[in-house]
């Protein structure tokens, strides 16, 4: 979804027979020149997402961008992201190429592993952890966000149960961000104006 000049939306995802599913929401900022672009929505079904498999059993589903010769179905995003769903088998060590001009992060949602040359802190838990947690800081497991310094590859060593993570990279916009709740602008003045329009019922531009 591209929010552009404004959109009100609702998604009703459908999981497996038990109602379970993985759900992720990634916000990619629009440059100031495109903030008021027309909103649009893309629906992509799972069978439409290409998967490539390496000789060591590593699976990569390409949601957006180009990777290992496959092109993802999601397009037209200004930050030009590469959005990958990566599964590395247990005990395998894998190097994944990344463009040096991009910022990159990984979000682990199954298994565990160790990432090399990540920024400090190496792994940022996205849920509270116990004060008695003694796991070494290099271990990134379920619901951990891993931030990377710039480089030309991401190196991961999968744990005993393998590891599955989202690997996302994009071109930095180098613009100020003003964000509150569901609205992202470039200045506080723009943000205030957007909420005033929302209150008046003039937020949506048809």
Model-predicted regions and their roles:
Residues 1-206:
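Jelly-roll (double-stranded beta-helix
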């Amino acid at each position: 979804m591209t929010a552009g000049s404004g959109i009100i939306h609702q998604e009703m995802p459908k999981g497996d027979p038990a109602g379970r599913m993985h759900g992720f929401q990634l916000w990619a900022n629009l440059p100031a020149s495109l903030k008021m672009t027309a909103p649009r929505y893309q629906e992509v079904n799972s069978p439409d997402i290409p998967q490539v498999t390496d000789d060591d059993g590593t699976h990569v589903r390409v949601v957006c961008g180009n990777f290992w010769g496959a092109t993802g179905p999601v397009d037209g995003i200004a930050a030009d992201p590469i959005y990958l769903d990566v599964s590395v088998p247990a005990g395998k060590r894998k190097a994944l190429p990344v463009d040096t001009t991009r910022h990159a992060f990984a979000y682990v949602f199954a298994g565990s592993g160790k990432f090399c040359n990540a920024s400090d802190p190496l792994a940022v838990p996205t849920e509270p952890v116990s004060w008695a947690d003694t796991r070494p800081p290099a271990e990134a497991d379920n619901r951990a966000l891993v931030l990377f310094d710039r480089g030309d590859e991401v190196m991961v060593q999968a744990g005993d149960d393998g590891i599955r993570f989202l690997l996302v990279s994009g071109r930095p916009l180098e613009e100020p961000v003003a964000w509150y709740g569901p609205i992202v602008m470039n200045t506080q003045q723009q943000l205030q104006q957007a909420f005033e329009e929302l209150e008046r019922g003039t937020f949506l531009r048809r």
